[in-house]
């Protein structure tokens, strides 16, 4: 259910702001989006898993706050990020 190290490395190579970037807001949003997608698929198969649903809602809230921060700092970067990730907002 969680991301493997290789999946994280692929996301890091795609969304890094600079070469040694491991925790920028863009990268955090990309990782959260991948985890949210996986958890959504899990919940479609297991609708009574309420603990996972709560975790999903927490992740969605964290991603929303990070996206708000990015939008406040640089709206052009925000627009390109949500297009690249395929997020509707």
UniProtKB/Swiss-Prot annotation:
The keyword RNA-binding applies. SUPFAM superfamilies: S15/NS1 RNA-binding domain. One of its GO terms (biological process) is translation. Gene3D superfamilies: 6.10.250.3130, S15/NS1, RNA-binding (1.10.287.10). Transmembrane segments: none annotated. Disulfide bonds: none annotated. Pfam families: Ribosomal_S15 (PF00312). One of its GO terms (cellular component) is cytosolic small ribosomal subunit. GO terms for molecular function: rRNA binding; structural constituent of ribosome. InterPro entries: Ribosomal_uS15 (IPR000589), Ribosomal_uS15_bac-type (IPR005290), uS15_NS1_RNA-bd_sf (IPR009068). Keywords: Ribonucleoprotein, Ribosomal protein, RNA-binding, rRNA-binding. Belongs to the universal ribosomal protein uS15 family. Part of the 30S ribosomal subunit. Forms a bridge to the 50S subunit in the 70S ribosome, contacting the 23S rRNA. NCBIfam families: S15_bact. One of the primary rRNA binding proteins, it binds directly to 16S rRNA where it helps nucleate assembly of the platform of the 30S subunit by binding and bridging several RNA helices of the 16S rRNA. This is Small ribosomal subunit protein uS15. It comes from Crocosphaera subtropica (strain ATCC 51142 / BH68). The lineage of its organism: Bacteria, Bacillati, Cyanobacteriota, Cyanophyceae, Oscillatoriophycideae.
């Amino acid at each position: 259910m969680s991301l493997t190290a290789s999946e994280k490395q692929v996301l890091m190579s795609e969304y890094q702001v600079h070469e040694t970037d491991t925790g920028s807001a863009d990268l955090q949003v990309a990782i959260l989006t991948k985890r949210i997608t996986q958890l959504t698929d899990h919940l479609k198969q297991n609708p009574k898993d309420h603990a996972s649903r709560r975790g999903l809602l927490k992740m969605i809230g964290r991603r929303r706050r990070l996206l708000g921060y990015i939008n406040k700092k640089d709206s052009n970067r925000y627009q390109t990020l949500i297009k690249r990730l395929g997020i509707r907002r």
